[in-house]
């Protein structure tokens, strides 16, 4: 028996709840780390709190939660403070400052752990990897309900982070994009910054022992980064990051139970699979995001390239018709002039023929009335731009064709009217060729 057959709603339910609380708490703040280009601060803090944990163990000689929490939070806040101090004092970028601080503090923490190992029951593996699977075993009683301790802690952290984002969204937005302007509007961007850093430290520490370093760092960065690929609006980005974090937590735990059985293994780390799932969600967003997705951008560029090529063919046919109305060029003739690939030219000609802009007579093409109307406006745009570039930009007539050839594809009727108004004489272009009239509309 394996996989979902082993599912226990009490045990697995609390594990998922803990994962969701950690993921959403981290993602809410992670949006502003991503916007400030400080994505790895969460990683720096989760490494740099080791000396705080070790110091708390050495002082209290126990693993009780309160000393651990306080020591780690203090170390996390000091990490943010030291990073800012080194960045300002040393005139280095944020990434270099974080690298100096977290490696130094992490090394110090390891030394302290070694020194404390004989006196304190300290498990570095727990610190690094967490044990979210053990969440249901450590419970407390609240209002007659027995719930896992970490769920109670992370619920408080989530509420605090959510309230902070809701009530200070304007300040966070402004200080993230323009700290100087934020200060001039009446609130201190530095206070907002250090409050954010403090909450990042608290969130990291609250999640650290249960879910470990991997999941905390992943949820600070990956869901916000994925949401950033899906939208340009901050409010939507924050909501999407929370949704993606939730999906990663749920599907990550289910995958940790089911996927290993496909390969003959019993199970794997839930925290690790949650991080992997978040990474897969980012890959999907990076590939198929509606504005910035790699595949979508590629398709959009191909459509634009095809649109430009079809316009170039139509405009070229118009110019050929101007010079020699009897000439009906074939694919090879057009491709040679346009320097385009044979397959691209052939497919575009087929499309233009199918949409009644060109007529095909045994492989020789000529404009239809519909195609001639479109070509006339493209050529008009081209020659108006040539006139404008000579008259207003001071360019010579020999150097304007390539510029106008690009601009003609992004010129609508309104812009043509503006160009027409701004030029002194618009009957002919600088080369003496007639400028076609504007299409009359009813």
PLM regions and their residue ranges:
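Structured cytosolic domains appended to multi-pass membrane proteins
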Residues: 323-442
